[in-house]
Amino acid sequence: MPRPPKWRWVRSEPNVTYFKPVGIPLSMLEEVILTVEELEAIRLKDLEGLEQEECADMMKVSRPTFFRIITSARQKIADALVNGKAIRVEGGNYKVYGEDMRGHGGMRHRHGWYNEED
């Protein structure tokens, strides 16, 4: 029996979920799928400039797991940029904590609010 997936915590659902090269019709594009937690890892490490340990803590994963997530994300983004592929952001094993809810016990899951103690 496989292990149940562990949730990765993200600040919010992405507002933009599709990126494509200009001048190439959608019908001719290959896609790379970037998960929501991979996008969050890129946001925390590369955009916010946080240390890997802090990023892992915020996503509630171990440092080795964070390293695997960020490595996968960077590889997918590099593939899309170098090879002219579209990037679709979707899926993953994540829950949304929301900036105003961090540390308050209540977290928003993709399907509504719940308490950490539940």
From Swiss-Prot:
SUPFAM superfamilies: Sigma3 and sigma4 domains of RNA polymerase sigma factors. Pfam families: DUF134. InterPro entries: RNA_pol_sigma_r3/r4-like, UPF0251, WH-like_DNA-bd_sf. It comes from the Bacteria. HAMAP family: UPF0251. Belongs to the UPF0251 family. This is UPF0251 protein TTE1845. The lineage of its organism: Bacteria, Bacillati, Bacillota, Clostridia, Thermoanaerobacterales.
